[in-house]
């Protein structure tokens, strides 16, 4: 008997709820704001927000300020890497050779990882480079460069400060020199060894 009354009470509440007027249904529907579909063009959406001439202000491991704007007039290679990244370690000698052998090219290495400066110094004793290194946090990367989708990731900056090309994955000195020539920069003269060779 109690079960029957409980069933009647539940059905009665359901009928009453269904009979009430829904004022929200009478109101005109709001038009939702268009939401960009990141799957349609994820790279394009991110690139559109990036400036043509990115700024980069970091402090190197040596404690020196490094500002991309102060390197105008040179081709600058901005290389995101990490100590744990094997392909990053493989390209470091080529980037060092490029920085040493080509007066018109400068390289900055951005260690994109959570690592203490002392630990980075120990790493660089085993894997030395000829260019400055700065540690940047993975939670606060430079705003004018898109967050790397993988490591290593390298940007080639033209002497006027604009971005000539981006490389995802390991890059060889010859690829950078070819990209410089394609962008109107100096070609490697015949008979001169390629940096990193």
Protein language model regions, located:
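Short active-site neighborhood of thiol/selenol oxidoreductases, capturing the structured segment around
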Residues: 66-89
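Thiol/disulfide oxidoreductase modules built on the thioredoxin-like
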Residues: 122-130, 135-182, 191
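Short, low-complexity, Pro/Ser/Thr/Gly-rich segments in the mature regions of secreted, periplasmic
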Residues: 183-197
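Sec-dependent bacterial lipoprotein signal peptides
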Residues: 1-17
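Bacterial signal peptide processing site
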Residues: 19-22
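N-terminal "domain-start" segment that seeds a small globular fold
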Residues: 29-68
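Structural microenvironment flanking redox-active thiols in thiol-disulfide oxidoreductases
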Residues: 89-127, 137-144
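Hydrophobic beta-strand anchors of alpha/beta hydrolase catalytic cores
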Residues: 77-78, 107, 154
